[in-house]
């Protein structure tokens, strides 16, 4: 029995199974461990950032079964049996389309928000392959950029949309 001290009350660790970036994992954790902590500490996946810790900034954005989620608001027990994708799961041998767009369109400044922004756009474009400018703004509404680099972020999003649209020029950002 693996026990973790949580103040004066011992808390029992439990076994959880999940797929992270295509790899099956079994991990022992306290059920209320934040998924962001599990990803960063147990799996050494530090691309998932933690900033606000209350689900308002989007720095910890991940995909759970392809749906956008905040890792800082998701507990280990909620991830049990699910497929998790982090920013590290997008890159195999070459940069993903979203990552390339951010790189070539200047969609980052300090880079702290970039993983969350890219993950949020992956979720948006999966659900809405040709989003309007308003759809893009709404899709990124849960992600904050401390450097206010929104112009480059929107250019990156529009480039992705354009590439998915066969490269045709469009109005918008």
From Swiss-Prot:
Keyword Hydrolase: no
Annotated positions binding [2Fe-2S] cluster 1: 52, 57, 60, 72
Co-factor: note: Binds 2 [2Fe-2S] clusters.
Pathway(s) it belongs to: Purine metabolism; hypoxanthine degradation; urate from hypoxanthine: step 1/2; Purine metabolism; hypoxanthine degradation; urate from hypoxanthine: step 2/2
Gene Ontology process terms (BP): hypoxanthine catabolic process
A GO term for molecular function: 2 iron, 2 sulfur cluster binding
Keywords: 2Fe-2S, Iron, Iron-sulfur, Metal-binding, NAD, Oxidoreductase, Purine metabolism
Cofactor(s) needed by this chain: [2Fe-2S] cluster
Induction entry: Expression is very low in excess nitrogen (glutamate plus ammonia) and is induced during limiting-nitrogen conditions (glutamate). Expression decreases when allantoin is added during limiting-nitrogen conditions.
Catalytic reaction list: xanthine + NAD(+) + H2O = urate + NADH + H(+); hypoxanthine + NAD(+) + H2O = xanthine + NADH + H(+)
Class in the EC hierarchy, top level: oxidoreductase
Ligand binding ([2Fe-2S] cluster 2): 110, 113, 145, 147
Annotated EC: 1.17.1.4
Domain 2Fe-2S ferredoxin-type: 14-90
Complex and partners: Could be composed of four subunits: PucA, PucC, PucD and PucE.
Task performed by this protein: Oxidizes hypoxanthine and xanthine to uric acid.
Name of the featured protein: Probable xanthine dehydrogenase subunit E
Organism: Bacillus subtilis (strain 168)
Taxonomy of the source species: Bacteria, Bacillati, Bacillota, Bacilli, Bacillales
